[in-house]
């Protein structure tokens, strides 16, 4: 077998890049990733926590990729072993966190949208995930909200309000997926994981939300990466084949 290309890593977003949003990766995609790993070092970076990424990419995800970064790299694994962890609670403190959560819940309570379900705020290790409709809606309701949001700008308006109200906390608000947005301290976006990849001369990042405000934007635009904007898992495979396997 040919040796891996030295000094090069292919780093992937999850939703919309390796999988359809919140869906499991297809067997074909997983087979391709195994083949690609023989050619280059591979890593995955997702905004979700490790349990959600495992649901999508498999329970052995921390071993299937050379690097696995959940919560934008605030929880980091290399070769299946933990190499770093950062906490929002320690960073902000409970008082500021409570102020932010209370305001957000009041805002959602006053929001007039067609349907609401449950789990409007999910507290993760390194971020808050906020969903105006509630995370435990059905897939059909997700699709419906995404269409509604594109017309009514529910998430962008909410983000603008929170950004202004909590400017003193120096937070980033990042819209991702179909129904939610993430809230985390500035610099805790996906570029956070790059500190673990300084030995690589080429970091190829693949993501779908690479526009300003999207949760792949900062890492896609970073001078430390070579950014590739993709539209689907099939597009990711095609771009990787052209880059690394042709």
Curated annotation (Swiss-Prot):
Q: Taxonomically, which superkingdom?
A: Eukaryota
GO biological-process terms attached to the record? GDP-mannose biosynthetic process; L-ascorbic acid biosynthetic process
Give the temperature dependence: Optimum temperature is 30 degrees Celsius.
Tissue-specificity statement: Expressed in roots, stems, leaves, flowers and immature fruits.
Residues at which Mg(2+) 1 binds: 13, 15, 208
Q: Which PANTHER family match?
A: PHOSPHOMANNOMUTASE
Q: What else is known?
A: Overexpression of PMM increases total leaf ascorbate content.
Name of this chain's protein = Phosphomannomutase
Q: Which organism is it from?
A: Arabidopsis thaliana (Mouse-ear cress)
Q: Which gene encodes it?
A: PMM
